[in-house]
């Protein structure tokens, strides 16, 4: 459990409308459940059009986890277009494939993780800002991925990392320097993530 109350925990608006872009992942509705504690939610599949996304006129967008690689349109659908065309104006949170897509959409590279991880918790070191405001250092984050952000574009700061057994640092969070885009590689909605509700609440409190 979190040992610190996140900054802005009581500041979530009661009229928020959050749109999920579902990358066909079993975790999507766990995320929806978390967000539904604070906001009205709507889910569209990544096969939706950009017009569909814009027509919803959300206060925020969450890009779900999912299988595949962001270079493949069949895996991410409208996700990259959302990141490039909508997210500069609409606060956006990417999770797992959502992070990989954000990095890829802005010119970064995505490679293979040193080892595939599915359902293990790792300590997350972070900068204490944005979705990490008020959270303890080294909280346990549930990881489920075989890809990793290898080269993060200059438009982003690396906001969170974890280390492998040999000391290799892996990107676990990014934040755009100008646009309201944040993303995490771990899964806030996993039972393995000790502060998952706090991460979501911090994102919503920042709207």
Swiss-Prot record:
SUPFAM superfamilies: Class I glutamine amidotransferase-like. One of its GO terms (cellular component) is cytosol. The keyword Lyase applies. GO terms for biological process: L-tryptophan biosynthetic process. GO terms for molecular function: anthranilate synthase activity. The active site is at residues 96, 187, 189. CDD domains: GATase1_Anthranilate_Synthase. Pfam families: GATase. It catalyses: chorismate + L-glutamine = anthranilate + pyruvate + L-glutamate + H(+). Residues 17-207 form the Glutamine amidotransferase type-1 domain. The keyword Amino-acid biosynthesis applies. Pathway: Amino-acid biosynthesis; L-tryptophan biosynthesis; L-tryptophan from chorismate: step 1/5. Component I catalyzes the formation of anthranilate using ammonia rather than glutamine, whereas component II provides glutamine amidotransferase activity. Tetramer of two components I and two components II. PANTHER family: MULTIFUNCTIONAL TRYPTOPHAN BIOSYNTHESIS PROTEIN, MULTIFUNCTIONAL TRYPTOPHAN BIOSYNTHESIS PROTEIN-RELATED. This is Anthranilate synthase component II. The gene is trpG1.
